[in-house]
């Protein structure tokens, strides 16, 4: 049992009792236990916001072209190739698409996003607000693959006057307006890539992804001025920075961010609760100015908040055939703040399930973790391949979540590959350290000699995958024949 960690529901229920007192000029009396419960809820609530802010600072405190994913705000940073075998900058790297990342800054004005005609090719431009909710997802599924223009506006911007936009800012008549919940936004763009031979085609598409401040749209782009901030910690991972903050630093930083990034309209209950411990939108926070009782209550909130998150992880997804399936409330979390925080901690930047889902293998058909000392297969019966409208893949990682170097330089198998099917039409994929034979190498995903795991990716999943009617088949461990010694 976790000491002093009542659930979010419990602490929010206290709001009803406190409502009349909230009308008074002075703060209502609160016990240390009540304050601690609210502080833990506040820690969980703010976790994605702080994670996004540190990630933004690291990713944008760089000159364009110096590093994958890093570059100034209001520019697209295009990743031109898959990560190499020895790349360890990101866990569970993607070998299906090439990324195009952009951090939008709309503190002064809206921005215009332009995309080229991808000629039917799958692409995705999910837009995350600073709370990590995907509020828009232009791309293959929603807006098609023709060239398009999107006007992204910050909170409180003036009403949509389409004709005035077209005349004053020279926007195309078919420009689509997207209202952003926060003035900073992260676009994590992806473009389908069928292996290295496809790079040149994809790079031409990436070159057509553009960001422009509204006042500069249609004009010659101004040179980008980059001022590197030496105070930004560029070496320590955002997760580590957030997880090691003291309560005073954490909540002070959260209060400053709350001045710029408004809470969602449905957050009012927890906002009302946080006022009881001195955290209020539009105001700075100093833990040293609190009553000693409140200081004690807040001091251990980070540790207990992280314990609560760790406790919840094992039950966050359903497990079927050894695969962890997480399709509910992904990308848009509503008031499920605990799940939102956990996703930000373990996989910042999650998509909407309608765009992509990621079954994670936890065990083989015997219930044991995967190990390269054994040989495994997964078999999709004829007509029972992963149900997608776009494409699917399976990627293999070592126990730390990194790709494994191998003679084929193959880190994933994907539906675009020329697989060799069985006579009955079924498809069998092999996961093992040594080649299954030259005639089967088209279906082979090389494994390390030690522990490994698998991630399946379904892009544009069909309804049966989203609802659980379809689930991945089990990963079967091959039976080994043990010789009997003469005794």
Where are these regions (language model features)?
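General helical structural elements
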Residues: 7, 17-18, 461
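A compositional/structural signature for long, glycine/proline-rich flexible linkers
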Residues: 24-487
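C-terminal segment of classical bacterial N-terminal signal peptides
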Residues: 14-23
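Bacterial N-terminal signal peptides that target proteins for export
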Residues: 1-10
